[in-house]
């Protein structure tokens, strides 16, 4: 049960109702502070729709954060989003292998992106070696977008956990295929 109410469009001022187009519990809770919700949505919208970073790399990084932090909401939502941009079941299984320190079938760049996401999630910063490995393949713009994407989703999982935002039933199906360790 969420710690703040989920608001419906009729409960908020008309000028903020556009923020509920996605009709997710996250957005319904964030509109308790509509201007903050708009700022949050601006960053999330840029990451998803404005950035020219390879969307598969973006989603692998986000999935890594969600998996590491055992964020059911984040992980399941981004499995669905990731599939829409080319993330395969083999990619998700490879991410799980990489997380456990086992070899995977991923190419070096996606492997390095996952490692960078792990380092930022659990160690605050990406190591020099990982940063250099990724940077050898990405422009300055894409490197900036990647780092800010990982940082943003590290924040998102903390918002989801602190606010105890409930996952929508249609996303729980993902957990049958990819159960999060330690999450029931």
Report each predicted region and the residues it spans.
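Hydrophobic alpha-helical segments
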Residues: 1-184
């Amino acid at each position: 049960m969420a710690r703040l109410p989920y608001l419906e469009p009729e409960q908020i001022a008309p000028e903020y109702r556009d923020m509920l187009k996605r009709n997710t519990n996250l957005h319904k809770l964030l509109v308790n502070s509509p201007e903050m919700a708009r700022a949050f949505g601006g960053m999330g919208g840029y990451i998803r729709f404005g950035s020219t970073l390879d969307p598969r790399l973006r989603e692998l990084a986000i999935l890594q954060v969600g998996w590491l932090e055992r964020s059911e909401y984040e992980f399941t939502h981004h499995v669905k989003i990731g599939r829409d941009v080319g993330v395969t079941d083999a990619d998700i299984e490879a991410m799980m292998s990489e997380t456990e320190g086992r070899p995977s079938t991923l190419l070096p760049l996606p492997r390095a992106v996952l490692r960078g996401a792990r380092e930022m999630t659990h160690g605050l910063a990406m190591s020099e070696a990982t940063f250099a490995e990724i940077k050898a393949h990405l422009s300055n713009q894409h490197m900036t977008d990647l780092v800010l994407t990982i940082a943003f989703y590290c924040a998102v999982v903390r918002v989801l956990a602190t606010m105890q935002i409930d996952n929508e039933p249609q996303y729980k199906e993902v957990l049958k295929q990819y159960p999060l360790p330690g999450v029931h």
